[in-house]
Amino acid sequence: MAGYLSESDFVMVEEGFSTRDLLEELTLGASQATSGKVAAFFVADLGAVVRKHFCFLKHLPRVRPFYAVGCNSSLGVLKVLAELGLGFSCANKAEMELVQHIGVPASKIICANPCKQVAQIKYAAKHGVRLLSFDNEVELAKVVKSHPSAKMVLCIATQDSHSLNHLSLRFGASLKSCRHLLENAKKSHVEVVGVSFHIGSGCPDPQAYAQSIADARLVFQMGEELGHTMNILDLGGGFPGLEGAKVRFEEMASVINSALDLYFPEGCGVDILAELGRYYVTSAFTVAVSIVAKREVLDQASREEQTGAAPKSIVYYLDEGVYGVFNSVLFDNTCPTPALQKKPSADQPLYSSSLWGPAVEGCDCVAEGLWLPQLQVGDWLVFDNMGAYTVDTKSLLGGTQARRVTYAMSRLAWEALRGQLLPAEEDQDAEGVCKPLSCGWEITDTLCVGPVFTPASIM
């Protein structure tokens, strides 16, 4: 092991002991605390992060993963991923400082934000971070002045109209402008070494990767014609973090592998990267949030006859809302569904319920239309799949939120991490069997791969 992570950084649990068990212990302790101050906290299963990594290597063996630090910069995550050998994709000075503070060398960092502050470019130059991205002439000029020895990656626009987050509205050079940018880089003696793209989060169409890889091949040809040594292809992110996503990770991987074989075949001398955030951390984190207040509202029309519920609704107020942990309600249009820390009895009546955050305005609604038993102030609600853009969010209500995270890992996952037991070393005869360190899905030999796109023409 490289020494980034030690046993003192997490709670070692035995097989069969779940994060929900640990949450129960922690919520009990928090409820019994005498300070009266109760705040939301996370439990993170680092073993889930390890399993996701092995799954990635199994299905995309030619791709070198970089972790998107801005997705979740909690130290436990950074340390376990550094231990696994990942590179780190940083968007700003603070993220570069953070990963270098834990010992990650500059050679494993890419500053992937194509629109950086001059201070961030100067920091990268001073601290040896040479791999930077750009997508416009202004950014190129800033790099020429502040970091002339940088190795630049040209970020191209993608067809991300089906994605939840359309990054092409903000970032990415059009194919029509790429030759001009490459020519300017050559005239300015700036080395362009590759191409990157990002299809956006929540893209339901894996063929978007194939189209972008085909487009990248065109830009590689332009760069090589102009004398640039093009040897890096960055696939960006957009990989699903949930097992129940519309498009399974294996399906995406199959499409990507087919496109890589066609446009960047093995042995072509191109180093292939990907920047993953949600993929690694979404399902690894669970958050516990307490009820701080409640209000009962009499319904005008009772649904008691249809549902057995009493004729009233209940509004619960939480210590976290959409301007903090539950920001996905605003940005990803999600509807968080809680699990109750205390299991209700079968004969308890259900009430139409809604959950609201602490902001004193009408937009801080976490969830509504829920049917829950009668809950009390001080009770805990548990939300799964809360690892992406939650832990270190900046709240509009009071600056940066320092949220407590308890890390856990099973002994089996710890031993696998220490020995780097990759799936390739397992029994190849049991291909259809999900092993403890598999990705958690059954493997199929019949994944449906659509046609690979051909490069678009450039006018």
Swiss-Prot record:
Changing K116A: Does not inhibit interaction with OAZ1. Reduces interaction with OAZ1. The keyword Ubl conjugation applies. SUPFAM superfamilies: Alanine racemase C-terminal domain-like (SSF50621), PLP-binding barrel (SSF51419). Residues 117-140 are annotated as: Necessary for polyamine uptake stimulation. It is found in: Nucleus; Cytoplasm; Cytoplasm, Perinuclear region; Membrane. It comes from the Eukaryota. GO terms for molecular function: catalytic activity; ornithine decarboxylase activator activity. Keywords: Cell projection, Cytoplasm, Cytoplasmic vesicle, Golgi apparatus, Membrane, Nucleus, Polyamine biosynthesis, Transport, Ubl conjugation. Ubiquitinated, leading to its proteasomal degradation; a process that is reduced in presence of antizymes. May also be degraded through the lysosomal degradative pathway in a proteasomal-independent manner. Pfam families: Orn_Arg_deC_N, Orn_DAP_Arg_deC. One of its GO terms (biological process) is positive regulation of catalytic activity. Expressed in the medulla and chromaffin cells of the adrenal gland. Expressed in the Langerhans islets of the pancreas. Expressed in the inner part of the seminiferous tubules and in spermatozoa located in the lumen of the epididymis of the testis. Expressed in the cortex, hippocampus and cerebellum of the brain. Expressed in normal and neoplastic mast cells (MC) (at protein level). Expressed in testis, pancreas and brain. Expressed throughout the differentiation process from spermatids to spermatozoa in the inner part of the seminiferous tubules. GO terms for cellular component: axon; cis-Golgi network; cytoplasmic vesicle; cytosol; dendrite; endoplasmic reticulum-Golgi intermediate compartment membrane; granular vesicle; mitochondrion. PROSITE patterns: ODR_DC_2_2. Belongs to the Orn/Lys/Arg decarboxylase class-II family. ODC antizyme inhibitor subfamily. The N-terminus domain is necessary for its localization to the ER-Golgi intermediate compartment (ERGIC). PANTHER family: ANTIZYME INHIBITOR 2, ARGININE/DIAMINOPIMELATE/ORNITHINE DECARBOXYLASE. Monomer. Interacts with OAZ1, OAZ2 and OAZ3; this interaction disrupts the interaction between the antizyme and ODC1. Does not form a heterodimer with ODC1. Antizyme inhibitor (AZI) protein that positively regulates ornithine decarboxylase (ODC) activity and polyamine uptake. AZI is an enzymatically inactive ODC homolog that counteracts the negative effect of ODC antizymes (AZs) OAZ1, OAZ2 and OAZ3 on ODC activity by competing with ODC for antizyme-binding. Inhibits antizyme-dependent ODC degradation and releases ODC monomers from their inactive complex with antizymes, leading to formation of the catalytically active ODC homodimer and restoring polyamine production. This is Antizyme inhibitor 2. It comes from Mus musculus. The lineage of its organism: Eukaryota, Metazoa, Chordata, Craniata, Vertebrata.
